[in-house]
Amino acid sequence: MSLPFLNTAPGYDEELRNSVFFERGLHATSICGAVGAAVAVAMLQGQDEAGIASAAGIAASMGAGLLEANRTGGTVKRVHCGWAAHCGVAAADLARHGLTGPPTVLEGRFGFLQAFCGDRAHPDAVVRGLGTDWELPRVVFKPYPCNHFTHAGVDAALRLRAQGLAPADVTAIELGVAKPVLRTIAEPPEAKARPASGYHAAFSGPYTVAAALLGGGLGVSHEDFTDAAARDPRRLALAALVRCVEDERCSASFPHAFPAVVRVTTRTGEELEARVEVNRGGPGNPLSDEEQARKFHDNAVRSLPEERAARTLALPDAQSVEDLTALLTSAGER
């Protein structure tokens, strides 16, 4: 396996990531992420091509993650991203100390792509555009701390709220999304209407639409996903009014976008609709600098003192390497 092939490990084709992995119940973030992290760490360590290949080969035996918790419960998915990072560092260190991995770990008969994707794996697509078509500009910054499939519904609900819709006036809500999205945010319906915890609320279309209509944070914030918030009678009453359905326009855009449409019926019989075609946070609908700064701040102060969070946010204005070093060496202090 060549080094250019390795460098594409974290950047599998979008359709492959969002379709094949999820249909099999696999969490691509924690599986592909382990391999990508191993490559990045090995490169930062200055390992040669063989060492980087071994790091990827080792990580491919470590990466794991199932999506059943999205449907029926459990909070294990919260550790998936951290586990991928852990695997990447461990794999690179093991390779640096002499452990080896199979050189055809990605494309081999019993390799990564065949094991996880079967006949739908297309290794050629992984290297298409290598060196000319960069994925980084297409990175999406999530504005809300909930499943990405819920975001367009959140924004549609926020749009209706901004137009003056009062939650107390709502008698029925229809949330239209792409058909493949329903299994994540709408099924089983009873569990999505009454999430078992704040964590499970983050994967509920009905709950996130209700939270958006009630307002808060950037629209929906961490405070909306506590266990107490998930038990809030106002939120649950509003979520119970939400019916999730397939919308053909949304299905036509999937998986290149995760659009949604929210249709509301009011007590007076008025019917309102808001459709969001392009998710916020990506190149087609980016967050403003102020929104990104606010997101960083709101997350950072959950672990760092306010002063240190502010200093970190001001990092682009650092006058010297010493300023950066001082900030990094004190990052673990509270």
Residue ranges and their predicted role:
Residues M1-A90, P102-R109:
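Glycine-rich, mobile lid/loop segments that gate access to catalytic sites or pores
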